């Protein structure tokens, strides 16, 4: 097995060499390792022809895994008193959010949180006024379908739309959608951990590990990356389907994967990928036969998943000509390294004493000692079929999170088109976190069983819960967002095309545009079109005549200047615009103690 595994690793690009005292060993070709595996295999058959290749899997109903399969095949009743554990899980998942809950219009920064509020508001606007062009944003004029330049967060947008259309503040709606993700994740992990362990106390620990996972704090600005709660439930739904396949269970599995895809396209794609080794391991351990009922169940799941992926994927496919593909060089810069699983997120309070000199954005992947410790207990032998599948799929997610630094991600990139649009393979780290949280629940269940013999299980529950809460506590730095928009936007109409300066504050302008609806030559998203990147270079010396001509060619009809966001260069820019032919003032005022101006830009002759 070792030689065969070595052959696979070498074939995937893991060729290497090593030195033994007096000897240099070359592992450059898979054929030598494969030949060695064949020789060992023949020798093993010669010595023990009747011993199964995988004796640990057992045979027939006496298999050690059969009891677990029967548990998942049934629909066990909800345990008495479980409601209290659910309440504890939900409250624990929100305890470190308290500073933000007290100030629902505060944000950690003026980038992605503001962008998310604009996304939800723009989707609601299009849904109500132009549903045929649902993904058309008002950024990067004159490109269409600009909501597809990043994750459209369709699930959150559909839920938020009625509130925004009724007049609710989009930023508060977006923040509430953000907050909801934490208890939703905790409930998802609670349910999955309960189905795996049968212990509501262990489920509470699993829910806390998932709901407060370090990945949440690393990505505290990203709305869609908080929505991890469908993933553990989908894994459990797959187990249940393999245990007792029915079309209904297939539809349930498909719906969960579809919901994850609609909430976060990254996680939907990654979940579907990780489910392959996970399902294969469970099916192998349980010796699942390819019956007609299994085919029906999997077909039902596939239909639901295909419909959801196609419905959301089609607009992205249509805009692919503009967006192109992520080159592997760019993917490499957002690929994790194994050592970065030891780099804690900055907001993880218990580890702020550790230097962050070598940490990189998107790659602070340390899950916390409590998570690792409980997961280590969870993977101690003997292993169940589900635990084994979690270990294998977690290892696969870890390998894929390495992206260009790993062995197999380039194959995903080459053979599966959706992966050619993925910018950050390191986000597979969220799936590693899912596995660790579920294994942590298994570890907690083992500790509770061990403590029950001395009647210390209640004390063990309180201590473990307290340790998890302490280990995964967060320090949040928040700031209030502007309570009002600059007064010049009262003169802006939807037919205008704005060039707004300074250029690097696009999320703010996008949020202000929710009220006026004008289009913008600039914008902020996960992808920036070549035309905008070129325009940025052409307006570096704004307000020169050449830069104004570049804005005209880009389609701009008006210019805004915001001195509160610009600072020192602003008075010089205003003087230059006032003295430039073809630029005429439309509106002016003061906002947050500084000048703001709106100018009309005469078109090219």
Segments from the language model and where they lie:
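Hydrophobic alpha-helical membrane-interfacial segments at the cytosolic entry of transmembrane helices
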Residues: 82-91, 255-256, 289-314, 328-333, ...
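Membrane-interface coil-to-helix junctions
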Residues: 91-185, 213-228, 334-358, 404-409, ...
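Start-transfer (signal-anchor) and selected internal transmembrane alpha helices
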Residues: 1, 37-97, 296-303, 380, ...
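Membrane-helix boundary/interfacial segments in multi-pass membrane proteins
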Residues: 18-30, 218-225, 335-337, 353-363, ...
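Membrane-interface helix-loop-helix junctions at transmembrane boundaries of multi-pass membrane enzymes
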Residues: 76, 286-299, 374-408, 449-458
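Signature aromatic-anchored transmembrane alpha helix within multi-pass, membrane-resident enzymes
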Residues: 298-307, 438, 442-471
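Extracytoplasmic
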Residues: 327-329, 334, 463-605
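Membrane-embedded helix bundles of polyisoprenyl
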Residues: 89, 93, 177-196, 200-284, ...
